[in-house]
């Protein structure tokens, strides 16, 4: 486990550094060709550099369009971050869960409506709305209104 953790942390650092340097397109290609990278999203979104976190959000927005099925791979690493001590991590995780659109996040996001941080509360509400919107649109498209 130790070796895998070290490799993951090295890869998280590498991806974050590339994101900070503006290599979003390259990172999109990496994720599209290796779905095993999705579990690293939870580690990446905890980076203290704003440019990295904004880039990870852009990455997930783009991958939601290009690689819809595989973005679910980020879900398990993001859900526990809704209880993180740092408000920016809770908020960013909530935002990414909204982008992913998995209904399994709804109960945990509902709890954030009572978060001590106003920004986190707002982001959680927006994420909940986004998930409902995505599923309403999917129901309309499939005829399951």
Q: Where do the PLM segments sit?
A:
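Amphipathic alpha-helical scaffolding segments comprising HEAT/armadillo-like alpha-solenoid repeats
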Residues: 2-10, 32-46, 65-81, 102-114, ...
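Structural detector for internal amphipathic alpha-helices that build alpha-solenoid repeat scaffolds
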Residues: 13-33, 46, 51-69, 88-102, ...
